[in-house]
Design a protein with these regions (language model features):
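Intrinsic-disorder/low-complexity loop/linker signature
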Residues: 62, 113-114, 121, 214, ...
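Generic alpha-helical secondary structure signal
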Residues: 54, 78-81, 127, 131, ...
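Extended, compositionally biased non-globular segments
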Residues: 229-245
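Short, structured coil/loop segments at alpha-helix boundaries
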Residues: 43, 66, 90, 134, ...
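Short, glycine/acidic-rich beta->alpha junctions
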Residues: 52, 85-87, 166-169, 245
Length: 245
């Protein structure tokens, strides 16, 4: 049956990985360096160079896959007025740099009272948010690049499954697919330290998930270099929460 064929395919894949990576054991931790070696070896270089959130959004929409609505794409100073109109007309949204990594430049706007916006960086005004967009376009988070592109998009609400065990923000699930097969999965849970961002570098907790059924297999807070059994803020048990299909 189908299950037998999938098991056989996975068994063959694991045997191939053993041959390719003979120096490492399969139960070793997949470090960033090892992961990056796999990325470099098995992916065309131009894919990493074009890791654009906007481009990814258009590709997903073309495949009829849901993605947060884009309110504004700001590529130049001439686009700032459009960004301001979006900011002033909405109470909830997210500002991101198009191709930043590690959560750099993100502002999450959860609501507003009058002219004051409740954000992941504390109270802000429309002027302050637009100023942040301008800094993104001017290249503040662009590394060696001279300029950048900002994206203002809809804010995603957390699933009730994760809202109960996370400190605000929106947890996500990441799955590494190797040669067409899902091999490793994890969820990233925001904390107070990460300011509601599901970003491990900022303080979020990473919880490994069994690919077969989503069962938690261990939780680690990278920013504190420690394994944890419970969420540091909510106290939720991170060894037994359910992840539905």
């Amino acid at each position: 049956g189908m299950a037998t064929r999938v098991q056989l395919a996975l068994r063959n894949l694991l045997a191939w990985v053993r041959q390719e990576e003979g120096r490492a054991k399969l139960d070793d931790v997949l470090t960033m360096n090892v992961r990056n070696k796999y990325i470099t070896r098995y992916n065309p270089g131009h894919l990493r160079q074009s890791a654009s959130k906007v481009e990814t959004k258009w590709r997903l929409l073309g495949l009829d896959i849901s993605t947060p609505a884009a309110y504004a794409i700001v590529e130049s100073m001439e686009d700032l007025q459009a960004a301001r109109r979006v900011v002033e007309s909405r109470e909830s949204f997210v500002v991101k740099r198009d191709d930043a990594y590690g959560g750099e430049g993100i502002i999450v706007v959860r609501g507003r009272t009058g002219e004051t916006y409740e954000t992941s960086r504390g109270p802000m005004t429309a002027d302050g948010i637009v100023k942040h967009v301008r800094k993104i376009v001017q290249g503040q988070y662009a590394g060696l690049a001279l300029d950048g592109k900002a994206l203002v998009e809809a804010r995603v609400e957390a699933s009730p499954v994760f809202a109960a065990i996370s400190a605000g923000g929106v947890p996500d699930i990441r799955i590494i697919v190797f040669r067409g097969y899902p091999v490793i999965a994890m969820t990233r849970l925001p904390t107070v330290a990460s300011n509601g961002q599901a970003n491990l570098h900022q303080g979020a907790v990473g919880v490994g998930l069994a690919v077969a059924d989503g069962t938690p297999v261990g939780a680690y807070q990278q920013s504190q270099h420690r394994w944890v059994d419970r969420h540091p803020d909510t106290g939720a048990d991170l060894s037994a929460f359910p992840v539905p299909n």
